[in-house]
């Protein structure tokens, strides 16, 4: 399994001959190396409905005939836009031809904001994502605060690689993320959701230096880890 980081919370996984994108915020993302028009993808996994995570999902899904896996309300909202979706919910898992997906809790919000019409559409509960393929498991925490049930994620799953937000303000900051890493007990931890905007500026190298009992790795956009 090859896992690549593409800025903010964008993660690409290549496994079982398929390409999977998590939270494909590409257009308008100053930290990504990807352009939506160049991306080929078989499946898109979404943690929640905020624009900096849904991103280019509709365009990518339609262009590639890709399935979008998302929490129920968000999946329904996207299906009304002509997207092929597979709805799930917290605690549920499903085996796809590209791998197994399980949604975990995340403590955050989830909504679609239409700034032109000044409306906010509720898109269900936010989620973290456990993705398993080729006997390896990747945990993408989505946007979240620190919460004690992260201990359960670590106890019930053998996590090989975890992506944790460290930006603070909208999610947990570096100090809480260090504790999250301890509880999740992943072999390798990569920081995400930082330095995209001034309000979430952090030093990822200071974060990984504080990690204990795991390998911390800062990935620049386009860099990858092979599991």
Swiss-Prot record:
Pfam families: Lactamase_B_2 (PF12706). The keyword Hydrolase applies. GO terms for molecular function: hydrolase activity. The keyword Cytoplasm does not apply. Keywords: Hydrolase. NCBIfam families: PRK00685.1. Belongs to the UPF0173 family. This is UPF0173 metal-dependent hydrolase BCB4264_A4722. It comes from Bacillus cereus (strain B4264).
